[in-house]
Regions:
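Active-site bordering "gate/hinge" segments
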Residues: 20-344
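Positively charged n-region of N-terminal signal peptides that target proteins for export
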Residues: 1-4
Length: 344
């Protein structure tokens, strides 16, 4: 009896710890990315300008889009795409090819990859090689320009490196079930037609649209230091747009936006329709309202507006690349390692 219990318990533990390992091992795209990165890094090490760091980032996107206007369905579709963004750094962390080229490539800054790795492995490998080759050529050109420009420029006060070392990370999420990557298009078409119908037969309303977008991103990241990260990012948005025009010709648009990580957590139609009706009232009031004179002084911002304001006046100013760019304000240039906001 004791042996039987031990055997059953051992089998249970085996089953408990198999799924994660099995899922990661069966993720063919992850394996392809790791193999190609190692191979390309090995080959480029023999070039005149060898990379000191490389990484591959792939975003596999499944999207569902439904839109309606004035109660009529305008669009209903699901699609999938996969893009690759390699990064190749030449030189070293004190001076590399990203000094003047923050994206590390000419436009477009990403390449399309085939979707079916089971039947198109060679095509995926070829696409990775092509984009890596293009990025490397651009990296060499930018690195040579950077060195030449740095030689003739006045020595910079900023000695912060262009690249930071971080610990190696290993993280893997299994793919979401297929039913979690899509929505019922017919159900959402019905909902959006009801929402956008609020604008129908409203005098002076020029636009009355509603749109729902559900996106599931599966993100892959591997680098030459050994980091491997695979994770899922699902998110859903409903957007409502309304617009009118004043007698003097001024266009007056308004919009509503609702966000959730899961479509089932989005507001009900009753809530959105009520908000849309309030939008119609506001649009009608704006159309006949007198012109407001410019104002300079204190202002109170709503929650969403304050978030955007904070992002614009602070968020962009602490971006690393903006600290290195002479064409930017470099507000916090000399505050690396210091608090720029209250700690509490």
């Amino acid at each position: 009896m004791r042996k039987t219990v031990l055997v059953i318990f051992s089998c249970f533990l085996s089953l408990l710890f198999v799924p994660k390992t099995y899922g990661q091992g069966q993720d063919k795209l992850l394996g392809l990315l790791k193999e190609e990165l190692a191979q390309q890094m090995k080959e480029l090490k023999g070039e005149e300008f060898p990379p000191y760091h490389m990484n591959y980032r792939v975003i596999d996107v499944t999207s569902s889009v439904v839109s309606a206007s004035f109660g009529a369905l305008m669009n209903s579709q699901q699609y999938r795409s996969r893009t690759l963004v390699p990064q190749i750094r030449l030189g070293d962390a004190t001076l590399d090819n990203f000094k003047f080229a923050q994206m590390g490539a000419q436009q477009p800054s990403s390449a399309r990859l085939p979707l079916d790795e089971d039947n198109n492995e060679d095509a995926i490998r070829q696409a990775i090689w092509n984009e890596t080759n293009n990025r490397y050529k651009f990296a060499v050109d930018m690195y040579q320009r950077t060195k030449a420009q740095t030689t003739v420029n006045v020595e910079e006060e900023d000695k912060a490196p262009y690249f930071s070392e971080v610990p190696v990370e290993k993280y893997y999420e299994a793919p979401l079930p297929v039913e979690k990557t899509k929505i019922d298009l017919d159900e959402w078409a019905k909902r959006l037609k009801e929402i956008s119908a609020v604008f129908k037969n409203q005098p002076g309303i020029m636009q009355g649209d509603a749109m729902m977008i559900y996106t599931v991103e599966r993100r892959y990241f591997v680098n030459s230091e050994g980091t491997e990260v695979v994770q899922n990012l699902p998110y859903a948005r409903i957007m409502v747009f309304g617009e009118t025009k004043a007698d003097d010709g001024m266009e007056l648009p308004l919009n509503l936006s609702y966000f959730a990580y899961d479509p089932k957590d989005l507001p009900s139609n009753d809530k959105i329709i009520a908000d849309a009706k309030e939008m119609v009232k506001t649009l009608k009031a704006l159309r006949v309202a007198p012109m407001v004179d410019p104002y300079t002084g204190p202002a109170l911002l709503s929650g969403p507006a304050s978030g955007v304001f904070f992002h614009e006046i602070f968020g962009h100013r602490v971006e690393g690349q903006r600290m290195k760019s002479e064409s930017d304000g470099q507000t916090f240039k000399k505050m690396v390692g210091e608090y720029v906001l209250p700690a509490d």
